[in-house]
Amino acid sequence: MKATIVTVGDEILIGQIIDTNSSFIAKSLDKIGIGVHEMLSITDDKQHILQTLSLLQNKVDVVIITGGLGPTKDDITKKTLCEYFNDKLIINEKVLVHVTQLIEDYFKRPITQVNKDQALVPSKCEVLFNQVGTAPGMWLQKENTVFISLPGVPYEMKYLIENEVIPKLIAKYDRPFIIHKTILTYGVGESLLAERIETWEDNLPKFIKLAYLPSPGRVRLRLSARGVDENVLKNEISLQVQKLQLIISDCIVGFEEDETLEVVLGKLLTEKKLTISTAESCTGGKIASTITSVSGSSNYFKGSIVSYATEAKVAVLGISQEKINKFSVVSTQVAEEMATQVQKKFKTNFAIATTGNAGPNKGDANAEVGTVFIAIATPKGVFSEKFNFGQPREKVIDRALNQALEMIYKEILKNYSK
């Protein structure tokens, strides 16, 4: 089965907003065995919409359209669907009652004609009732293709996908099983990783596909199996993961689709009842922000000091001015003292510290752009490493973040997890 996702709206095409709807819809369809053939973003133009619908008819099984269902004049999706299906708009009484109640309860005013028009739907459509908004979804079919129109507001779209669209698609179609397993790796680049697992990859069964999903400091390996026997797929995926672990056990840190290193680190710290703090310069608090993005992180993360300026390192962290003058603020010595001092201040088992030059200029320390020192304070002492993450500034910060998390994770796993 194949599907196409169409987002309607000039605001997407001019870069004013980011299309997050397509990603959510694609993931939802993939979970029930419907593959997305393509994603399209088109203008708020009637002819463009009509042309797109015509091109997709009988090309794919399902077309999901988001956007253009609002109350303003530039929201033309409903009228255009009527033209394409040779239909007319009628009032849906259930939707009208819902819209009226919503306006009166939440906005404390009478309903206007513009609001009433939200209850207009093509007479041939099956209405997908939108409990969390005013614009209903619509389900239409022409020959072999189902067309589903949804509001562009993300939380309304998500509600309709989860509560209306997915259940109806499951009931309508026989679909293959699709099993995914994602392996999270750190510390090895994509090309080197590919070399290490080349033989294993070449011997994968034909019904299992491997995808490399790289990002700064990490590579996710996604195994996808498609077939009619779910148990066979699960067993084969499990077998292949076991084989992979024997090859790259040194850089695997997790196995879940949405699991990140900060989540894995949090689980490890929680399990071992350990605590952590950070002292950040060039990363500007990003390490602390990432660690605390995980629910329950207050159990192991005690605090952070962002000592960006040299005077803050001296006044707040207590780094000696003599040491800075002798070795430079971007140095092993300063990084290690930052980690040691913040560990003491927050009384934590571990601490991370960063100091460096993210660019674009050399700065007062005269360090090369991209130079970062990362220090880890442990119950047994402190150590640090020097890196050069190149340019641009955003890349330096992201790579320093990932490297710091990897260093602390591996240190705890290696020396403190028994």
Curated annotation (Swiss-Prot):
It comes from the Bacteria. It comes from Flavobacterium psychrophilum (strain ATCC 49511 / DSM 21280 / CIP 103535 / JIP02/86). SMART domains: MoCF_biosynth. Pfam families: CinA (PF02464), CinA_KH (PF18146), MoCF_biosynth (PF00994). InterPro entries: CinA, CinA-like_C, CinA_C, CinA_KH, Competence-induced_CinA, MoaB/Mog-like_dom_sf, MoaB/Mog_dom. This is CinA-like protein. Belongs to the CinA family.
